Amino acid sequence: MKKICLFIVIFTSLQLKAQSFDEYFTDNTLRIDYIFSGDVNHQQIALDKLNCSPHWYGKHKRLSELPVEGNGQITVRDHKSKAVIYRNSFSTLFQEWLSYDEAKKTSRSFENVFLVPMPKDTVDITIELKNNRRETQVSFTHQVTPGDILIRKIGYNNRTPFVQMLTPKDSTNCIHIAYIAEGYQTSEMPTFINDVKNTMEALFAHEPFKSMKDRFSIVAVEAPSKDSGTSEPSKGIWKNTALSSHFDTFYSDRYLTTLNLKDLHDWLAGIPYEHIIVLVNTNHYGGGGILNSYNLSMAHHRLTRPVVVHEFGHSFAGLADEYAYEAEQIPMYPHDIEPWEENITTLVDFKSKWNDLIKKNTLIPTPTTPANKNKVGVYEGAGYSVKGVYRPMQDCRMRTNENPEFCDVCRRALTKIIDFYTK
């Protein structure tokens, strides 16, 4: 009798979990456009626009769980019951900009776009931004009623042309990635498709992507630009491109990004996507990856393949940079706070990281010696800090472009994320 009751409880629990998406959501995407603005002392979040597009390509399970903590979170609550029915995490260029000196002198605004499943009933949506001490810096809550006549319908007609590059084994439980062309004229789209093939080959040469390839759906979106290439402000070069990308972001010559997130998602409206890889038609070195926002990389440099994979580590799984600068403007990771990223530590709470992968008698910190070259340890120098922040192995795809693979800790983190979305 006890076994029967236990079976009923487990079955009912699983049934409720399976039904939770259909209980609260329709098979459509609610795209919410925000403006984040302010300076180092005061930040503000404002609602810009609401949009609805056909089908939902994000997670259908574990709706109220976060894949990783991130530097910000979006939470959807049922208005009547106050139950949390969807959550996701993210990072933004706005938060990164706040760490630069310019943020001490002036205010700026940044576009941000988030996707959630379209609710069946009224919901309360909260956006939280956190500082580098993992404290909530600013919070904003607003209400969305699905019948609002000002919710703009997009992606139902006149979709951007796209090519299916990879078909998953199970289209109902897969990870949807969209490559999008930036700085490619219409006549250059065959080149773009070849560039997508090249970087896909690089990504799926790395574990765990290689062994879990059948869990991914990939499309190549042929967004045309009037000009070929990308803008280079330091050289006085400005191009008219689909996403208005440019080098010199935050006055860093190799930092290649786009600030036009509404344009990005307009091009993608109605197309199967959740994660985004932007390929920029340039042979100059540069790129950037932002958690659950986008990965943007140059397409025609000798290091394109490792850079695209590295930046996807950021945008897809929230992995931290494992390299260090001799001189950094502001420490990104306070040494008295444990970072949320799984591949770096300050040793404040090392048990929450890769302590279980450390072999007995391993010195902590671990000496950077030839004998320890392939050994999981605690090596000083990571997260842009020479001192006080540590990485799992001497080298990794998240540290250099030369290392051929992700380290053991990063592979585990990536595997966990893939399972999170697909199991």
Language model region names:
Residues 1-22:
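Bacterial Sec-dependent N-terminal signal peptides
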Residues 151-207, 220-230:
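Fold-level signature of zinc-dependent metallopeptidase catalytic domains
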Residues 183-186, 224-228, 282-286, 302-304, ...:
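Solvent-exposed loop/turn segments at secondary-structure junctions
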Residues 189-192, 287-311:
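Short pre-active-site segment immediately N-terminal to the catalytic Zn-binding motif
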Residues 215-291:
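Active-site-proximal segments of metallohydrolase catalytic domains
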Residues 312-328:
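Catalytic Zn2+-binding segment of zinc metalloproteases
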